[in-house]
Amino acid sequence: MRITQVTPLKEGFEIEIPNIASDKSISHRSAIFSLLSSSPARIHRYLQGEDTLHTLQIAQQLGLEVTKEGEGMVFTPPPSGIKEPFDVLDCGNAGTAIRLYVGLLAASKGYFVLNGDAYLRRRPMNRVVKPLQSVGAQIFGRDEGNLAPLTILGRPLAAFDYQSPIASAQVKSAMILAALQGEEASFFSEPERSRDHTERMLRGMGARIDEDQEGRLTLFPLLGKRLDPLEMTIPADPSSAFFFAVAAAIIPGARVKLQNVLLNPTRIEAFKVLESMGARLHYSITSETYETIGDIEVSHHTLQGITVSERISWLIDELPALAIAMALAQGKSRVQNAKELRVKESDRISVVVNNLRLLGVEVEEFEDGYEITGGTLQGGVTIDSHGDHRIAMSFALAGLVVPLTINDSACIDVSFPNFLEILSSIAKVIHESQTSR
């Protein structure tokens, strides 16, 4: 188990960061969608994190050929479509991978087994499995298909008109991937718009996905047609960049410029909340290919408490880092309608609450969120990451203010392998290793 100690800063900092980890959501999708393309895709800056490498390995098992080309990669699709794999498909800790692959493979001819690590095998899959089963998918697993490993007997599925009870990009993406392989148009709606990378990328590849004024999607099947190949440089992940936005916001005299960041409106809601709390932000667009990309400058200013209760699906991954900003803001902050946090890599509501209490913060826990009374932090404590990369990175930010130790920090490598390298450029970070857990 890796242990990380963070020593607090004595003064502010100014830094430009050109090497934020590539966007995880787009990296996952670039590999998966390339299985449906007509010719080789050319991808630059594919995220070399554990989650996305598991996704890429599975794509290779399903027939995708991956070769290096300069600093990029070429994804050549299987000529005869998705092939039945020889072995189990290991998703590691990647919830996005298993849920998107369930949708893709449920409608693909063949026998498939999706599995993952101990953390993933505890995460619920019914939100994807049940709607797919309702249109004929044969998916089996522990707890009546709710828990991995999942066995899929892929076959053509019936057209559907599905109204999701939750706003989830993973559920939406799974249903879209199944619908593309059908014979008639399907329909999908959700209570509020979730992240839309899947629609944007697939439209760019030639798929027809229509959206009405209420956000209801009409999904037209490919009917044997192959998609156009992707050709893209994957931008920096705004969820990863947000850690350093919070770092700048909470440290007096700090300023950070985050370069080449994905600026999709469904992905920068946390930045808008931070700005509403008082931090100074400036955006500049640098390019627009599939997605809007640009730079974000963040500088310190006194933060005020805030209530976050809307568009939760747009900032669900950033809420742990935002909790650190809330703990150092003036007044009370509250997060509501975020029950989804309980089924992430850890129960992020309980873990955030318990770790903030260790730091001396007054916090009240609710079923769907928490209320934080801002003020100061008390250091000299050990934070348990619970194997959750976003918990480990979020509380590393608290280490910029007070000294602390984070247990099981190796989980950071899942999504942001160079996080500690960047953090070390502004703070003293010490690694210690232990052989036993």
Curated annotation (Swiss-Prot):
Monomer. 3-phosphoshikimate binds at residues 24-25, 29, 168, 170, 317, 344. It comes from Wolinella succinogenes (strain ATCC 29543 / DSM 1740 / CCUG 13145 / JCM 31913 / LMG 7466 / NCTC 11488 / FDC 602W). GO terms for cellular component: cytoplasm. Disulfide bonds: none annotated. This is 3-phosphoshikimate 1-carboxyvinyltransferase. InterPro entries: Enolpyruvate_Tfrase_dom, Enolpyruvate_Tfrase_sf, EPSP_synthase, EPSP_synthase_CS, RNA3'P_cycl/enolpyr_Trfase_a/b. Gene3D superfamilies: Enolpyruvate transferase domain. The lineage of its organism: Bacteria, Pseudomonadati, Campylobacterota, Epsilonproteobacteria, Campylobacterales. It is found in: Cytoplasm. It catalyses: 3-phosphoshikimate + phosphoenolpyruvate = 5-O-(1-carboxyvinyl)-3-phosphoshikimate + phosphate. Pfam families: EPSP_synthase.
